Each structure stands twice: as structure tokens, then as C-alpha cells.
């Protein structure tokens, strides 16, 4: 069995305009001091990467790797760009801020920009020697997630058909560069659980570059079997966000969460160890399926400060990493290989 790599950290939630959070050398020095050995870079944040330059220049990428204080670049995350590949008009204004200023207010131009950005991420990943980018699919169907009023016949199929149409050229480009797109199954995306992932995968013709960024927190908040999911979709899991969550329903609110803010919702993300995810089981199953990439902290918590969350995250992940065995635990009782002996034991000779 291969061994999971880590601990690594997704930098998005920690970026800022003052040191040590404002440049790649500064922030990697900080997270290295906390015990992290890898960083997942938010490809949309110009404070740590110029994604177009990274796509166009291998020399730039080589220089970028030299700015990380010896830490590995685990992946280039592309969630915000992926979100804009497909956006229902109801969310146009809310998502506009994810895009470059020159395409805001123009849904068609914004989607075209997002497609180009995804291609930059893919080429930059290849230039950095990376083989996966965690992302979002975006959403055309999310406003119709609850079946009331009754959905028009065929609307779900049409939605996934269009989603696949938009993503297939990007996936083909990813295939040319040996990069998987690991979609995070996340509320607000048309792919938010296993069943919706299956619908998208089928609509793409089972495209080989469609993969999953596994994040158990989103499944806790949907009351799903997040450990069983690993066994069911293990061959598709190519990235791993280590994020905790808790679901504490009340007599007033449950899974939908009314319109409450994060602090008051029954379902909320938590710092590692403060929620309900059984990470012992998660890391055991991830090891069992042969997951061999990175365990990356994604920190989100309404109660705890980000610095405390990052500080606690590295030892938490390190504690859960499993050193795979070099021999079977019962080798001491083995008798070696002997064909004739095996045949005698089977009563064949």
C-alpha cells in the first residue's frame, strides 16, 4: 500500500495583505514553522502566483518552487474559476467578484474567461510537475435542488448535458497534459454528493479526467456515510481536504439551516478535532484504498481563530497519517511458499 503524504495546508483562508500572509516566501516560512511540509496554492490569488505566467513559462514555475522554503507545492486549487464555468443567472451578481474586473457584468465573457483560466491552471500544473487540480463544477441546476415546485421533465438531464458540454473541452485539455480535475462535492455545485457526481460523470461520457476532491465535512452536513463514500468512490478520489464539521439539529432548524449565519446554523465547519468527523476511520479507509497523494488542511471555523486552527492542524494530521507496513503482521508464523506442500494440504497429492 502507498502512504498518504502530509501534512499540507490550503493557503486560501490564510492569505492577507500583511506579513507573513502576503507573499509565497513569507507564508510558506510561517506554515513550515508550524510543521507543514506541503502547500496547496489558490491559483486565483496573485499574491502567491501569476497563473498566466505559470502557464506560459516553465522558468517561472521553477522559480516559484524555489520560493516555498523547501515545501512541496501539492496542487493548484481552481475552485473560483471552476465555479464560473457554469453559473445560473440567479447567482450572476453574487459570483461576479470571482472574475477579473473587465468581464464582470457580462455572463458570457465571464464564462469564457473562466474556461481560459482553467486551461492556465492545467498548463501551470503540468509545468510544476503536478497531476491534479481541486476545483468546482459550477452550477446550473442548484436553484432547483429541492423538488418543489415540481421540476419540468428532463430539466435535470438537460442541466447536466450543458454542464458536461462546458467542461468536456477543459477535461480534454487536462487529459493532454496528464492532469486530473478533482471536483469538490460541495453545496452550491451541481455535483454535491455521490449521486450528482455520477450524473455529471455519465454526462461527460465517463471522462477519465473527472475525479473527486474528498472532503468529509460536506458529507457530515448532509448526514451521509462519509466513510462508506471512500470505499464506493476510492478509484476517483485524487485529492483530499482534511476539514471537520458538526451537525447539531434542534427543534428549530435542521439540514437546511433556515437563513441562519454560520455561528447559529445546525451544520457548520469546525477546526480539526472540534467537530464530528471520525478521522481515524477516514485515514484508515483512505490508506486501505491506496490513496497516495496529499492530506491537505482546509481550515474553516466560525468559533476559532485561523492561526490557532493552522497551528493545531499540522500535528493533528501528522498524528493520523498511517505508516504502511513493510511486512504482514503474522509473518512470524508463516511457512514460506512450497507448491508441493500446498498440494498436500489441499489433498491433491
Protein language model features and the residues they cover:
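Acidic/histidine-rich catalytic cores of soluble enzymes
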Residues: 2-7, 12, 22, 38-39, ...
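Short, small-residue-enriched loops and turns at beta-alpha junctions
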Residues: 47-48, 82-84, 140-141, 187-191, ...
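Acidic (Asp/Glu)-rich catalytic clusters
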Residues: 2, 26-35, 53-75, 92, ...
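A short, acidic, flexible beta-alpha connecting loop/helix-capping segment that sits on the rim
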Residues: 14-16, 296-306, 334
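Glycine-rich, proline-tolerant flexible connector loops at the mouths of alpha/beta enzymes
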Residues: 40-65, 137-145
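Active-site acidic/histidine proton-transfer and metal-coordination neighborhood
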Residues: 21-26, 30, 85-211, 331, ...
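Short beta-strand segments at enzyme active-site cores
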Residues: 40-41, 73-78, 130-138, 179-184, ...
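C-terminal helical cap(s) of enzyme catalytic domains, especially alpha/beta-barrels
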Residues: 306-329
Amino acid at each position: 500500500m502507498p502512504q498518504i503524504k502530509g501534512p499540507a495546508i490550503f493557503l486560501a483562508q490564510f492569505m492577507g495583505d500583511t506579513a507573513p500572509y502576503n507573499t509565497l516566501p513569507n507564508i510558506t516560512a510561517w506554515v513550515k514553522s508550524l510543521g507543514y511540509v506541503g502547500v496547496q496554492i489558490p491559483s486565483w490569488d496573485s499574491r502567491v502566483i501569476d497563473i498566466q505566467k505559470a502557464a506560459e513559462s516553465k522558468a517561472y514555475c521553477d522559480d516559484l518552487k524555489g520560493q516555498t522554503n523547501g515545501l512541496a507545492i501539492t496542487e493548484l486549487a481552481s475552485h473560483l474559476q471552476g465555479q464560473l464555468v457554469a453559473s445560473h443567472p440567479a447567482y450572476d451578481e453574487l459570483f461576479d467578484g470571482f472574475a477579473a474586473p473587465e468581464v464582470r457584468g457580462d455572463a458570457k465573457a465571464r464564462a469564457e474567461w473562466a474556461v481560459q483560466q482553467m486551461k492556465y491552471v492545467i498548463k501551470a500544473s503540468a509545468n510544476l510537475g503536478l497531476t491534479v487540480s481541486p476545483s468546482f463544477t459550477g452550477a446550473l441546476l442548484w436553484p432547483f435542488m429541492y423538488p418543489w415546485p415540481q421540476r419540468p421533465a428532463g430539466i435535470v438531464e438537460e442541466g447536466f448535458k450543458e454542464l458536461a458540454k462546458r467542461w468536456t473541452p477543459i477535461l480534454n485539455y487536462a487529459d493532454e497534459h496528464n492532469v486530473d480535475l478533482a471536483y469538490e462535492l460541495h453545496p452550491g455545485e451541481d455535483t454535491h454528493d455521490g449521486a450528482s457526481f455520477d450524473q455529471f460523470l455519465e454526462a461527460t461520457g465517463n471522462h477519465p479526467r473527472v475525479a473527486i476532491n474528498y472532503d468529509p465535512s460536506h458529507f457530515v452536513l448532509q448526514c451521509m456515510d462519509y466513510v462508506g463514500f471512500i470505499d464506493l468512490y476510492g478509484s476517483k478520489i485524487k485529492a483530499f481536504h482534511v476539514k471537520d464539521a458538526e451537525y447539531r439539529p434542534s427543534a428549530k432548524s435542521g439540514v437546511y439551516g433556515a437563513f441562519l449565519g454560520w455561528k447559529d446554523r445546525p451544520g457548520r465547519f469546525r477546526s480539526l478535532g472540534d467537530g464530528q468527523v471520525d478521522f481515524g476511520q477516514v485515514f484508515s479507509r483512505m490508506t486501505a484504498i491506496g490513496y497516495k497523494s496529499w492530506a491537505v488542511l482546509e481550515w474553516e471555523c466560525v468559533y476559532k481563530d485561523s492561526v490557532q486552527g493552522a497551528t493545531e492542524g499540522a500535528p493533528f494530521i501528522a498524528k493520523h497519517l498511517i505508516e504502511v507496513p513493510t511486512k504482514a503482521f503474522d509473518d512470524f508464523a508463516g511457512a514460506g511458499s512450497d507448491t508441493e506442500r500446498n498440494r498436500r494440504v489441499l489433498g491433491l497429492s
